[in-house]
Amino acid sequence: MLSRQVIGLCFMLASLPLRGAAPLATIESMLLKPAVLCGRFEQRKQLVGLKNAVNSSGRFCVVAEKGVLWRTLQPFPNTLRLTRDEIVQMRGDQVALRLEARKEPTVRLINTVLFALLAGDIGQLEKLFDIDGSVRNNSWSITLKALEPGLAKAIGSIALQGGVHVRSITIHEPSGDRTSIDLVAIETGDSAMNVDEAKLF
């Protein structure tokens, strides 16, 4: 018969977060992979030297095989549409900026990283980052450190947390600036996108 001490140790070990390669497979199995995922975001950017954070909020959509829509509604309306081949910034119905991957090679990398972060694409993230993950109950967290020096210089380190979807993203930039993004009110399926968002794709 197991002693109370051994039983207690088993419970203690079971409650510790899992780490290493195995948890990444567990995390990947926990994440749903809908064709369409939309929700609201709340973003806080803390800049070095500024006491108050810069806050913004809006809606986002991640559409498989198409890209990402990032619509800032507050404090100023601004829309970013990121696809495999381009980044388009829109103000109202007007295109304010267009960056094409055939002219700017980094466009494809930026879009790949953002899509993987929002969708929780562990396989894609493993190609670009050194990943350390942990799982506790129905939640998980991972930290990302870029493998390529150029990407590391631009991004720094990233922390993700979530369950069946990514729920928060924190980016620690090399400059010391920090961006925290909470993803809330997440919906999936074609009905998750409103009419205006669907038109942008």
Model-inferred region functions:
Residues 41, 62, 68-72, 87-89, ...:
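Short hydrophobic/aromatic-rich beta-strand segments that constitute the beta-sheet cores
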Residues 8-15:
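Bacterial N-terminal signal peptides
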Residues 122-201:
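Gly/Pro-enriched, hydrophobic low-complexity segments
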Residues 94-141:
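Flexible, surface-exposed loop/linker segments and immediately adjacent secondary-structure boundaries
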Residues 52-59:
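Amphipathic hydrophobic-ligand
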